[in-house]
Amino acid sequence: MITKLIPKKVFFTSGAGTHPEKLESFEAALRDACIEKFNLVTVSSILPPRCEIVTKEEGLKELSPGEIVFCVMSRISSNDPGKTLTSSVGCALPVDISKHGYISEYHAYEESAQDAGAHAVKLAESMYSTWTKEEPLKTFSIPRSSTVKDSGDWMTVISAAVFVI
């Protein structure tokens, strides 16, 4: 028997990390977002029907270290001193919970968290509206911004929608 992997819950998080090594700056960002303990698999932009949005704390309680966890993630890295890095995920909730919504990912250099969040919402809203021909019930974003330190160490910024099966 094949089990369908349809998430029942989702939580949103973000993080930023810095380190002389690019990979370790990503690890630091995952730690800041509290999702470093999982084997993350990035997926595309669908919020499943009837998927409950929970707090990060609630979602983390249902996951185990080493678990394969699906997520929609925006990620950006640089070691260019003074450069501002911004990531965001946006969400468009369906009017009818029996239908799916959309999650977008967006990242940019030299853009404010507010602007990146607005752009991520615009993307999610557009994907939803062009499919349903209606406005979503609600939209929101989880933006994060940070600036590369003068030391030239790597900075990574992430935003993620993390699914719980």
Curated annotation (Swiss-Prot):
GO terms for molecular function: arginine decarboxylase activity. Binds 1 pyruvoyl group covalently per subunit. Its cofactor is pyruvate. InterPro entries: Pyr-dep_his/arg-deCO2ase (IPR016104), Pyr-dep_his/arg-deCO2ase_sand (IPR016105), Pyruvoyl-dep_arg_deCO2ase (IPR002724). The record marks 44-45 as: Cleavage (non-hydrolytic). SUPFAM superfamilies: Pyruvoyl-dependent histidine and arginine decarboxylases. The keyword Secreted does not apply. Its EC number is 4.1.1.19. One of its GO terms (biological process) is arginine catabolic process. It is an enzyme of class 4 (lyase). It catalyses: L-arginine + H(+) = agmatine + CO2. Keywords: Decarboxylase, Lyase, Pyruvate. Belongs to the PdaD family. This is Pyruvoyl-dependent arginine decarboxylase 1. The lineage of its organism: Archaea, Methanobacteriati, Methanobacteriota, Stenosarchaea group, Methanomicrobia.
